[in-house]
């Protein structure tokens, strides 16, 4: 769960910074990144109250480490009662059967999609590398957990190897 936090956290930051809307972020991560669900779609499925509680618990468990801090956006969603599919409203709106209502069209600018993927992957890879460095699990176990446990399209450390550590460090340095 700790390694997966940036999937939500960095996506929310991209939204809060005004770089892209939620539909575009979800679209980029699904179509370019190969993820089965976008982060906002997934938070709505899990329940924004549940996701916020898990995020807060991880933050508290790591002694309020800033990188795990819950966002104000998450908090406001919970306070508003916009918990996702179960309430018919979350980051997206849903009909009475829990199906997504018609939403806006995502931006299809390829450079924006790549920018989103690079940021989210860099943060995910950084978290996986930190877990590896601290001896939490082996490289193989981390990648197995992310592909089989969280259903990511690739293991994060295998993904990191495709472009190399220097590439991902460069992405992190400009964030």
Predicted regions located by residue number:
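N-terminal glycine-rich phosphate-binding loop for ADP-containing cofactors
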Residues: 1-175
């Amino acid at each position: 769960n700790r390694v997966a936090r940036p999937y939500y956290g960095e996506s929310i930051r991209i939204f809060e910074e005004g770089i892209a809307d939620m539909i575009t972020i979800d679209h980029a991560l699904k179509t370019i990144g190969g993820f089965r669900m976008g982060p906002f779609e997934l938070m709505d499925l899990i329940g924004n109250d549940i996701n916020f509680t898990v995020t807060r618990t991880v933050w508290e468990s790591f002694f309020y480490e800033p990188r795990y801090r819950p966002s104000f956006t998450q908090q406001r969603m919970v306070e508003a009662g916009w918990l996702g599919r179960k309430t018919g409203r979350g980051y997206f709106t849903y009909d009475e059967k829990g199906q997504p209502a018609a939403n806006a069209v995502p931006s299809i600018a390829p450079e924006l999609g790549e920018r989103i993927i690079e940021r989210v992957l860099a943060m995910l890879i950084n978290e996986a590398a930190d877990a590896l460095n601290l001896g939490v699990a082996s490289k193989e176990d981390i990648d197995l957990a992310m592909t089989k446990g969280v259903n990511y399209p690739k293991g994060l450390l295998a993904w990191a190897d495709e472009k190399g550590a220097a590439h991902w460090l460069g992405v992190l340095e400009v964030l």
